[in-house]
């Protein structure tokens, strides 16, 4: 895989209550990824950027919500979410700025 592509696969972490519980209970990290990313690309990107070993990746497509604006109904974009299961002893800490 192209190194440049690996840097563009991950768009950012998903910070939510459900993601925090997944990190504590199942040693998982949750990321927002580009919509055409594959599981193998996501795994390679996380291993390269965070220097951790990844056991598995599960992905899901999140449908954009329909929102009402002053000009009528609008729709937010669809996006892809990835649950990355880390190996025992590996962890990613998003809260510290290091």
Swiss-Prot record:
Q: Which GO terms describe its molecular function?
A: rRNA binding; structural constituent of ribosome
Q: Which UniProt keywords apply?
A: Ribonucleoprotein, Ribosomal protein, RNA-binding, rRNA-binding
Entry-linked SUPFAM superfamilies:
Ribosomal proteins S24e, L23 and L15e
> One GO cellular component from the entry?
ribonucleoprotein complex
Q: Which one Pfam family would you cite for this protein? A: Ribosomal_L23
One GO BP annotation here?
A: translation
Under the subunit heading, UniProt states: Part of the 50S ribosomal subunit. Contacts protein L29, and trigger factor when it is bound to the ribosome.
> Do you know which HAMAP family this protein is assigned to?
Ribosomal_uL23_B
Which family is this protein grouped under?
A: Belongs to the universal ribosomal protein uL23 family.
Q: What does this protein do?
A: One of the early assembly proteins it binds 23S rRNA. One of the proteins that surrounds the polypeptide exit tunnel on the outside of the ribosome. Forms the main docking site for trigger factor binding to the ribosome.
Q: Which NCBIfam families match?
A: PRK05738.1-1, PRK05738.1-3, PRK05738.2-4, PRK05738.3-2
What is the protein's name according to its record?
Large ribosomal subunit protein uL23
Which lineage?
Answer: Bacteria, Pseudomonadati, Pseudomonadota, Gammaproteobacteria, Cellvibrionales
Q: Which gene encodes it?
A: rplW
């Amino acid at each position: 895989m192209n190194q440049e592509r690996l840097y563009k696969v991950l768009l950012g972490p998903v910070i939510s209550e459900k993601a925090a519980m997944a990190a504590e209970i199942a040693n998982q990290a949750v990321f927002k990824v580009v919509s055409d990313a594959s599981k193998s690309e996501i795994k390679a990107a996380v291993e390269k950027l965070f220097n951790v070993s990844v056991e598995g990746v599960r992905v899901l497509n999140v449908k954009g919500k329909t929102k009402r604006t002053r000009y009528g109904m609008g729709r937010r974009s669809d996006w892809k979410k990835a649950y990355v299961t880390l190996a025992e002893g590996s962890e990613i800490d998003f809260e510290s700025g290091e």
